[in-house]
């Protein structure tokens, strides 16, 4: 009997080219050397979440994204496979694999130079064909930045529902400042994750406690809004959960949201049915997600520290405290 796929992660694939601790950005014609070298890393939401899941012990994870038929596309496939993930890319001959350049001057925030390339062109049909493998959970990231997927979200999510697959969708601010692609699909999404700024852009409400209610009124089911070091606010049914963050020394926040999604998915995959969880099981999944996000930011790189031992250490040292400071309340939703 063929083993059921635990998780399908779809969204963006890209290659990050990173130089940190630069003394300055040179004027035109200048040259500087990167004191810590220049690194090349796999990136993109689908890649990050799938690698995180493999590092947390999931053995049956597939990642889907769009790449070019080029050297960097091959690098992405090899890196996924080495990490324990089955790559299922859509490969284009005429469009290059996407690249993102990250430059950090000592004492300043990161500067990014990105391109819109193959990563934006993932086909809905490619995803729907992979959903025929009936994954237990389907993570769909980069919504707002996938040209064709954004236009057909309800169709893709209904295909997942037809396969009895639980869906978790993660969003980014859209290339065009219009959220219709998401709001029209909210009722098809089992769990939606977004950060506080994204929630504000959709609802016009800065308070996460009010924003989750606004999202529910737009049709969302289970909602998770994260606020970095301020923790998260979630709404499941009529119950709102507010949970503080774990306390860690932040080194690099890259991939923190992806890590949270991976931790949440990993916890739900321990259940018989990932979509029929009790409130306590959901709260623990949020706790594990926050621990994964906290572990992520303690080192450079989007997936470097998202490992079982680091998350277990955080849960053992701070988990009870975070839970004790969390609140659950019944919310009146008109």
Where are these regions (language model features)?
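Conserved phosphate-binding/catalytic region of the ribokinase-like
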Residues: 1-8, 17, 159, 208-334
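Glycine-rich phosphate/adenosyl-contacting loop at the front of the ribokinase-like
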Residues: 1-66, 71-82, 323-334
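A glycine-rich helix N-cap at a beta->alpha junction
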Residues: 79-95
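A short, aliphatic-rich alpha-helical micro-motif
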Residues: 2, 131-133, 186
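A short helix->loop->beta-strand "cap" motif at the edges of active sites that frequently abuts
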Residues: 58, 162-166, 219-222
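Conserved beta-alpha-beta core of the PfkB/ribokinase-like small-molecule kinase fold
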Residues: 137-213, 231
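Conserved phosphate-binding/catalytic loop of the ribokinase/pfkB sugar-kinase fold
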Residues: 91-92, 102-147
């Amino acid at each position: 009997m063929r083993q059921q796929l635990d998780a399908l992660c779809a969204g963006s694939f890209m290659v990050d080219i990173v130089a940190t601790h630069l003394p300055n950005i040179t004027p035109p014609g200048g040259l500087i050397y990167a004191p810590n070298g220049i690194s090349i890393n796999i990136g993109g939401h689908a890649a990050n979440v799938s690698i995180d899941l493999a590092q947390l012990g999931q053995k049956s994870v597939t990642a889907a994204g769009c790449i070019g038929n080029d050297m960097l596309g091959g690098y992405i496939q090899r890196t996924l496979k080495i990490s324990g993930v089955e790559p299922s890319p859509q490969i284009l001959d005429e469009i290059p694999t996407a690249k993102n350049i990250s430059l950090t001057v000592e004492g300043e925030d990161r500067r990014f130079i990105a391109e819109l390339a193959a990563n934006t062109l993932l086909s809905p049909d490619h995803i729907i064909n992979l959903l025929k493998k009936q994954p237990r959970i389907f993570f769909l990231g980069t919504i707002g930045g996938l040209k064709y997927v954004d236009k057909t979200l309800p169709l893709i999510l209904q295909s997942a529902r037809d396969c009895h697959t639980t869906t978790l969708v993660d969003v980014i601010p859209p290339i065009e400042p219009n959220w219709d692609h998401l709001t029209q699909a909210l009722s098809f999404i089992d769990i939606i994750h977004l950060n506080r700024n994204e929630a504000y852009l959709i609802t016009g409400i800065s308070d996460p406690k009010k924003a989750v209610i606004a999202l529910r009124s737009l049709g969302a089911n289970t909602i998770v809004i994260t606020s970095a070091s301020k923790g998260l606010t979630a709404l499941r049914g009529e119950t709102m959960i507010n949970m503080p963050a774990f306390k860690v020394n932040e080194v690099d926040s890259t991939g923190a949201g992806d890590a949270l999604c991976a931790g949440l998915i990993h916890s739900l995959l321990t259940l018989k049915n990932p979509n029929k969880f009790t409130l306590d099981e959901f709260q623990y999944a949020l706790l594990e997600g926050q621990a994964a996000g906290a572990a992520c930011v303690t080192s450079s790189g989007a997936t470097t520290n998202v490992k079982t031992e680091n998350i277990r250490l955080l849960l053992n040292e701070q988990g009870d405290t975070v839970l004790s400071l969390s609140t659950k309340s019944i919310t009146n939703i008109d």
